[in-house]
């Protein structure tokens, strides 16, 4: 098969299976880097590739999954040497069978900012080095797989698009709840990866065929019918006795049969699968044609954890905009991000679904500020952003660091504007707002505005932007100055919907400028526009009347089924003028958490929950003027972290928010440490804990997250790092008199090392308990190897520590 035939196949093609599984069976030594075998034992690697190609794999992944500068640190070989050898081995093995060689690329093993310490551009640079080496060595395509962080996948995709001409397959790993480890949804992955230029999207690892199927179905529904989709499930889960995985090749082939209805581009296997698994898939997918029936694509804007499908009226918060706001302009000039972040949090709480972001003000460097504000906003809100600027460089810098799929506000009908902005939207996968205005100005007639909108739509389509990502703003003119043109805006909006098939947007509040009682005009105009087909309403979400109009409209047009959202928002509300309202204000909070948030610690607790580091520090300083340091910890910080942890467990808050809350709590703890030091006191630890990623395992993202959470609960953590020898763990526990140990392992190949570490701790007769965690672990396996607890995540680790130390 030739590369140019890759996406023209008449039958679902087969991918390969697990490489680590085969190497483990061949006796891979604990701690050895699998990728170094490309150089030290090429015959072994070629043999595995050849087995997969002979079994029917049309795309075979080179043994380069961990060939990154991060994971090869300390190796005798350079990244380029390892990748070149890996590609050459695979090509030699595949040549007799006509299979293609993919440069296999996995995560770098470090969390990106703001959740971690790896800078986005540093990640792009490292991936650029990887993909350039792969293309130079002769790879036919790039296969990004096993990603859990959408931001890291974006860095990888940008590196590939900017530095190579190779086709790209992109895959993420999802947990049983339908999200990745960092909380990314299937739909956000699909929208972002497709927008950034991936040629196919898929799901691999983590789970078996039955568990992945519902997510694969969602993935297929989230992309056009002719867009390639693939899967590579695991062979179930590792057996507790360490004898492999719990799904046989025959059962795997049987469980893959339902995937025929998805008309996949390709299918294969991941952990636990072998050439025998792939061979049986030939029968499973015989006669299965790729590609699904065409369907109307939704318009999706997203962050990793929040996917907003624009189907009907959607509220865009307008308050992050310095126009006419002296305090906001001052905050931007002074770099006061806390003020900006507070605007975001308050709008999200009021019900905004998207946030408009405009940082254009006198005396500021707008491109620099746009990048800074986008990064800062992503640390405290999961709402998608609308980047609002006429400055092309500002848009470019904001788009580059945005995590997900944003919308740009805006371009217009002027050819030079279209030429400057549409390519940016195409490159970064953003939706675009087109203003129905050109070099001749605003046209009074609806038909003339529609004509401009048509030109914008045609230009956007020609630039490769899909119709569902095109939004037209027919321009809201002030009723005080151009009353006769108000209806023309509504008429033009309705015509754009019907004639062009695009989405629409309006800055609603402009209608009332210069007139009294603006809310009346805004709400009435909003209602008129919604009836005409308005999709995005840029408005103040704190306006109760306007928000009520939105919710009521969705009920009356049957968009809010069973009035669910309307009831959720308004069930407990009563008119402010009634006696009932006064009684409601005096009523006790519905639960303990709400009661806490009404007390003297409410502001600090809210700052921690929302991840507002500056506010958390400021509120802590204010409290310390009246309260004792440990009182602030016990009455505010620990309860706030408990609230965040409970939301994390319930799935209403996700890893990025958990880490930002921990970061905000840490800023508060720093103030408390300073206060204690000034009093000449020492801060007491709630307990000492050793953490380590076991020998042979270089993955420590999960362990690092556990450390952050434990430290914020007041525990002293001795972090031994990754690839930690058994004797180092034992010696540290003995010498430091530690009574609780946390061990982490990500790979099946290092589970034996975890078992050996636990056995050594027991043999040394140390007075300690052991908790274990990692992607490949199960409660049953943890019990089998002698662990006292299985910690499924960082929150559970904190609960175990609190239980153990009695705090």
What are these model-predicted stretches?
Residues 1-473, 477-807:
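Domain-level signal for soluble alpha/beta catalytic cores
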């Amino acid at each position: 098969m030739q590369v140019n035939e890759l996406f023209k196949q008449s039958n679902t093609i087969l991918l390969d299976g697990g490489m680590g599984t085969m190497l483990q069976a061949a006796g891979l030594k604990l701690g050895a880097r699998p990728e170094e075998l490309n150089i030290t034992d090429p015959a072994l690697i070629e043999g595995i590739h050849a087995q997969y190609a002979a079994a029917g794999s049309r795309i075979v992944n080179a043994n380069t999954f961990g060939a990154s500068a991060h994971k090869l640190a300390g190796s005798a070989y350079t990244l380029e040497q390892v990748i070149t050898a890996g590609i050459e081995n695979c090509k030699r093995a595949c040549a007799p069978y006509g299979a293609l060689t993919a440069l296999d690329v996995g995560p770098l093993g470090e969390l990106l900012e703001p959740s971690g310490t790896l800078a986005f551009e540093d990640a792009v640079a490292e991936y650029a080095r990887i993909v350039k080496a792969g293309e130079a060595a002769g790879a036919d395509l790039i296969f990004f797989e096993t990603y859990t962080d959408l931001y890291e996948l974006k860095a990888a995709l940008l590196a590939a698009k900017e530095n190579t001409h190779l086709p790209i397959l992109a895959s993420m790993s999802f947990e049983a709840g339908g999200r990745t480890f960092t909380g990314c949804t299937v739909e956000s992955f699909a929208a972002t990866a497709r927008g950034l230029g991936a040629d196919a999207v898929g799901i691999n690892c983590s789970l078996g065929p039955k568990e992945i199927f519902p997510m694969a179905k969602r993935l297929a529904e989230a992309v056009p019918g002719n867009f390639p989709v693939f899967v590579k499930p695991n062979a179930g889960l590792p057996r507790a006795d360490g004898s492999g995985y719990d799904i046989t090749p025959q059962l795997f082939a049987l469980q893959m049969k339902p995937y025929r209805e998805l008309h996949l581009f390709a299918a294969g296997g991941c952990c636990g699968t072998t050439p025998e698994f792939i061979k049986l898939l030939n029968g499973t997918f015989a006669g299965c044609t790729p590609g699904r029936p065409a369907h109307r694509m939704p318009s999706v804007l997203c962050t990793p954890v929040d996917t907003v499908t624009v189907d009907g009226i959607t509220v865009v918060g307008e308050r992050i905009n310095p126009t006419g706001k002296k305090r906001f302009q001052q905050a931007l000039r002074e770099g006061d991000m806390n003020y900006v972040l507070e605007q975001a949090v308050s709008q999200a709480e009021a019900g905004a679904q998207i946030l408009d972001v405009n940082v254009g003000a006198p005396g500021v460097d707008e491109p620099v500020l746009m990048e800074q504000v986008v990064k800062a906003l992503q640390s405290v809100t999961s709402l998608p952003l609308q980047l609002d600027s006429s400055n092309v460089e500002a848009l470019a810098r904001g788009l580059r660091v945005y995590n997900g799929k944003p919308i740009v506000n805006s371009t217009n009908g002027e050819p030079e504007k279209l030429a400057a902005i549409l390519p940016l939207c195409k490159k970064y996968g953003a939706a675009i707002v087109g203003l129905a205005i050109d070099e001749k100005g605003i046209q009074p007639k609806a038909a003339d505005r529609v004509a401009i909108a048509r030109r914008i739509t045609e230009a956007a389509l020609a630039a490769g932007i899909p119709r569902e990502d095109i939004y037209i703003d027919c321009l809201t003119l002030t009723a005080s100055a151009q009353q006769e043109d108000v209806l023309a805006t509504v008429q033009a909006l309705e015509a754009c919907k019907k004639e062009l098939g695009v989405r629409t947007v309006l800055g609603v509040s402009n209608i009332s400028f210069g007139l009294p009682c603006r809310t009346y005009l805004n709400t009435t105009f909003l209602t008129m526009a919604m009836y005409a087909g308005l999709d995005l309403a840029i408005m103040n979400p704190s306006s109760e009347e306007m928000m009520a109009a939105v919710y009521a409209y969705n009920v009356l047009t049957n968009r809010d089924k069973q009035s669910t959202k309307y009831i959720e928002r308004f069930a407990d509300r009563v008119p402010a003028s009634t006696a009932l309202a006064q009684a409601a204000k005096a009523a006790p909070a519905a639960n303990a958490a709400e009661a806490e948030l009404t007390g003297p610690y409410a502001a600090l607790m809210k700052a921690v929950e929302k991840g507002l580091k500056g506010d958390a520090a400021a509120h802590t300083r204010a409290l310390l003027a009246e309260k004792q340091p440990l009182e602030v910890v016990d009455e505010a910080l620990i309860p706030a972290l408990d609230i965040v942890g409970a939301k994390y467990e319930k799935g209403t808050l996700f890893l990025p928010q958990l880490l930002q809350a921990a970061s905000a709590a840490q800023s508060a703890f720093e103030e408390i440490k300073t206060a204690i030091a000034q009093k000449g006191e020492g801060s007491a630890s709630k307990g000492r804990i050793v953490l380590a990623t076991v020998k042979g395992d270089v993955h420590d993202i999960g362990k690092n997250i556990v450390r952050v959470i434990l430290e914020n609960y007041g525990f002293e953590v001795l972090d031994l790092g990754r690839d930690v020898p058994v004797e180092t763990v034992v010696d540290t526990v003995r010498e430091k008199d530690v009574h609780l140990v946390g061990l982490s392992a990500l790979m099946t190949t290092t589970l034996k090392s975890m078992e050996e570490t636990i056995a050594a701790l027991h043999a040394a007769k140390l007075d300690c308990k052991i908790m274990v965690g990692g992607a490949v672990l199960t409660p049953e396996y943890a019990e089998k190897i002698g662990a006292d607890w299985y910690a499924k995540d960082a929150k559970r680790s904190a609960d175990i520590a609190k239980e153990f130390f009695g705090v």
